[in-house]
């Protein structure tokens, strides 16, 4: 019996795919460093709302890459045989996998890893085209099948996009090569099977769920666990929240309060839990009020800055979800970078039938270990350890 138990534990551990994430300077920070942010903001209106609920044709998805402006967490995957490595965003707010290819002549591709099908013995071409639109242009490419190495296992026969054009020279400064989407297949452009679905269908993960831990302090230590939960990353028990709409990881918020007073979402509202969005975003009017309450003001770079000395005096902002309170302290919702501090809130307006929509991005996820349960269509949350 003891040996059977040990064997079962070994089998489960082999079906838990652990993908380390590293924290790097964001695209925004790289643009500031290179004196390019003002030019970027002039030519690319940063609109986080355009990522969600796009109007799309059958072969067109709308996934604005400007919305990854502040993303800081990235993982490495390999594609092909032998594997060609790529740095990607593990994004619960989209569903496609795509990387640059050697067919791409855009400046944006020139400083990134590019997939070469000729160097892979397992690549299978298709005649399908992919176009992911955003801003003033679109990422165009083709779809193909190959083996994807993720967390030490081989995801065979995985469909993915190979970019041929990537508009906007700003992507030259992006700290990532491509995107690995972890949302539901219903929002996948071209009907492409997402990576996690393919892993589950092949029996490569032991549970139909995955979880995310984002470290607040270290460049390393963050992780995506495909197929399992690691209780060492959180304290107490997981609280489960039903997914309200299966597409994005969308849930219902009860309210948002400060000092016991409701400041937003007074009658309940919808929220998307999105690892591919760095900040906490909500309706522009509600966010404007919050920025005023915490003393944030816009600087010449379009950032909402705040005095770092305010961190010790400001109150928590509390998100109540499914009857459970999830407080964010000022040190969580105010972002410190050297001697400067910026607000972790950003305004957006998304026209949805469900009304007010919020995005719980990395500012929230850093404080709460998050489980994305596909089997039961639930999101699990617990304070990080």
From Swiss-Prot:
The active site is at 91, 274. Its EC number is 3.4.23.1. GO terms for cellular component: extracellular region. It comes from the Eukaryota. This is Pepsin A. GO terms for biological process: digestion; proteolysis. The lineage of its organism: Eukaryota, Metazoa, Chordata, Craniata, Vertebrata. It is found in: Secreted. Residues 16-59 form a propeptide. It comes from Sus scrofa.
